[in-house]
């Protein structure tokens, strides 16, 4: 039995969907613990592409229970559309469970999100405009609508009549937007409630029961460590906690129940939206990474900013999440490069630093200090073992593992399930490297 958290170790979009899909083969339960439709994951199976935002990656396995936890925020319209999409493809969603205490994104959340971002002007943070921040804000203000409220028609009518009238004042007076019709919204969401009712349960009890029965549970995060509300590049962050600690809060599982944390990183770095990005590449090289990596957001279609691998934020992610091992994705994107650079430290106002600064203003002044490695100039997409990889690619992987001080358990070389090298069992294999007295790692990727 193993209870495993899969987290993003960069700014999101690391390929968590594929890695979670791979690990779901040996999982009995897959749980999404935070975020909403502001994040998407893409899974490619036998040439067929599945793009999901709320439903966990394990949905493609009929014997795997899939749970949307209490730490998420749910847009019922989009969730129902995902359910219908899967049914059209003859994929059952009978094993999908939704937390009754998850909060619900309402139409006024989306309107306020978009209007607020527009009003920020040059201070915009790059929100997706899907209403995620305002939904979490209402949760904190204790004025939010929860899934269990949708299941109570009389209570929902009373709650929404007051809430929508209150939000209409904000929409009209602050943002000069037309008001919402309370009755129209109420009827719309009562309809959503009936569609979702068969899936709604106390998911914390379901997860607790699975733990007691010693089932394998996979906790799936959205976004990434550097987008965490408390530990990311604030204010250019999301409104929840994608870090490993968020899995406990967002599901109702005690921290002593977690056995392992797997971090997912690209072989380079991407970021979407605003905020500092020390290793960002402009010009032809950045465009090459973007094109080869198909770096366009699943949710918004926005072009992602691309740059070299940043080991400073990588080590930070290892520390903040307590990562035991790493899955490295999109190694194949680097196949055409003569040389590859890795950021090993920052120059901050003339001082060398190997630590991630907590201030975004200071982070914006960071200049990368690079180590240059030779490229391999051959395709790796057909490699299925470490022995198949060119020596320069092996050297690159070993260098990253040494910098991160965690073993690399999985190497992904394309979008399909089979384009993967399993270096070590990511569930039961080596954990975070122990250090010798001189500070050098005791166990790392060996080739």
Swiss-Prot record:
Binds 1 Mg(2+) ion per subunit. InterPro entries: Adenylosuccin_syn_GTP-bd, Adenylosuccin_syn_Lys_AS, Adenylosuccinate_synth_dom1, Adenylosuccinate_synth_dom2, Adenylosuccinate_synth_dom3, Adenylosuccinate_synthetase, P-loop_NTPase. The keyword Ligase applies. Its main location: cytoplasm. IMP binds at residues 13-16, 38-41, 128, 142, 223, 238, 302. It comes from the Bacteria. The keyword Transcription does not apply. GO terms for biological process: 'de novo' AMP biosynthetic process; IMP metabolic process. The active site is at residues 13, 41. Its cofactor is Mg(2+). One of its GO terms (cellular component) is cytoplasm. Pathway: Purine metabolism; AMP biosynthesis via de novo pathway; AMP from IMP: step 1/2. Substrate binds at residues 298-304. Mg(2+) binds at residues 13, 40. Its EC number is 6.3.4.4. GTP binds at residues 12-18, 40-42, 304, 330-332, 412-414. GO terms for molecular function: adenylosuccinate synthase activity; GTP binding; magnesium ion binding. SMART domains: Adenylsucc_synt (SM00788). Plays an important role in the de novo pathway of purine nucleotide biosynthesis. Catalyzes the first committed step in the biosynthesis of AMP from IMP. PANTHER family: ADENYLOSUCCINATE SYNTHETASE. HAMAP family: Adenylosucc_synth. Homodimer. This is Adenylosuccinate synthetase. It comes from Nostoc punctiforme (strain ATCC 29133 / PCC 73102). The gene is purA.
